Amino acid sequence: MQLNSTEISELIKQRIAQFNVVSEAHNEGTIVSVSDGVIRIHGLADCMQGEMISLPGNRYAIALNLERDSVGAVVMGPYADLAEGMKVKCTGRILEVPVGRGLLGRVVNTLGAPIDGKGPLDHDGFSAVEAIAPGVIERQSVDQPVQTGYKAVDSMIPIGRGQRELIIGDRQTGKTALAIDAIINQRDSGIKCIYVAIGQKASTISNVVRKLEEHGALANTIVVVATASESAALQYLAPYAGCAMGEYFRDRGEDALIIYDDLSKQAVAYRQISLLLRRPPGREAFPGDVFYLHSRLLERAARVNAEYVEAFTKGEVKGKTGSLTALPIIETQAGDVSAFVPTNVISITDGQIFLETNLFNAGIRPAVNPGISVSRVGGAAQTKIMKKLSGGIRTALAQYRELAAFSQFASDLDDATRKQLDHGQKVTELLKQKQYAPMSVAQQSLVLFAAERGYLADVELSKIGSFEAALLAYVDRDHAPLMQEINQTGGYNDEIEGKLKGILDSFKATQSW
């Protein structure tokens, strides 16, 4: 075969004419060191704080330290195969996670990728994990309740929509149990829930997901997981990712509840990252900005006004306020609430529920210490009936604690003191509650009414539990319409008081327990 030189030259000319040169400018750098999930990069001149850096193997790192001649970044995911000399690129984007209703009922990781084996996510777009909290003008005061279903909490330490209420206590005092029951109690309230598990065992999280499914609450909940085996970067970012998912509902005029379990582990992960980035350590080796770590997260939990929602949705949603209620959990060491992270979070939040080991071991569950537990804004959100009936409970318990301390030294007690001690013991017994058994407002109100009006005076201490169970079974059977009315309105007047009195009188006269 003979080659024609003219044809070949024509063919080459055609190819040259068709060739399209596309130049792509990107900021490229080189990894100069890798240590425990933190990489140092040389050459990323235009990198921004918090920017995602593209690594080999379809992974990303987040730039946290911007120095004169290098960038310190944390790797999100496995880092064992990264080595010096590898090329990395800036992306010009900050970290975003998928948000939307399609995430409800799903278990996702920090980056929003599903890990429950139920297929791809159906999301409504992406949202930045770091967002500025709503300003003062965009907020509205807290005046609607979030019912946890616990008598001890809803009566003495009420939580409102848009509030931040800290759950604090030693390990094994029922902190997660309280939070999970609060989620289970939102099945029919319309409040969407987000549960963020930070640094926990995978088996523990699996158990939580199973319990939520058993009680019909998973369909209303997003579970965000950063297990103990995952990198410190993912544990540090998990709460912000969960918060972004909760803000989706808040900004559209809906109510959401988010649980951070727990922020102590997030602070430890952040400390690890900061020390590896050679940031100067402070108290307890935490970096100087550990307060800001939690304040910028918890300030995003708020109740926003109707104008904010209308502006955000461009007029699609009108006349509705939105809220994101946060229940951060902090684990203390030997009951020391004066440690660095606990004091920080106590000062940021609007109150705390303090769970005590001694009470837990004594069989008082939830192990709430009513003396130092407080809700700074929840009182305004309480329903009328709960506010009316719960005042005497706190007083009775305070008097009981004071008298119980003195009665240990006094041999003979007068009748009035003996009655107060007896009443206090019975109220303490009445506030005990089993796990996964949240109570409605009407049920709580009836039980508190019985304690407040002296109906427990002739009931033996050992029979308080069976008295309560029999009373609730009796009203569910014979007085369901009244219970329904109280649940719907939460109101309290002479008529309702008379009906409650009539129920208790007839119950004590005709029933046994």
Swiss-Prot record:
Enzymatic reactions: ATP + H2O + 4 H(+)(in) = ADP + phosphate + 5 H(+)(out)
InterPro entries named in the record: ATP_synth_asu-like_sf, ATP_synth_asu_C, ATP_synth_asu_C_sf, ATP_synth_F1_a_nt-bd_dom, ATP_synth_F1_asu, ATPase_a/bsu_AS, ATPase_F1/V1/A1_a/bsu_N, ATPase_F1/V1/A1_a/bsu_N_sf
Site for Required for activity, residues: 373
Annotated compartments: Cell inner membrane
Broad enzyme group: translocase
Any GO molecular function: ATP binding
Domain of life, source organism: Bacteria
GO biological process: proton motive force-driven ATP synthesis; proton motive force-driven plasma membrane ATP synthesis
Assigned EC number: 7.1.2.2
HAMAP family, per the entry: ATP_synth_alpha_bact (MF_01346)
The protein's name in its UniProt record: ATP synthase subunit alpha
Species of origin: Escherichia coli (strain K12)
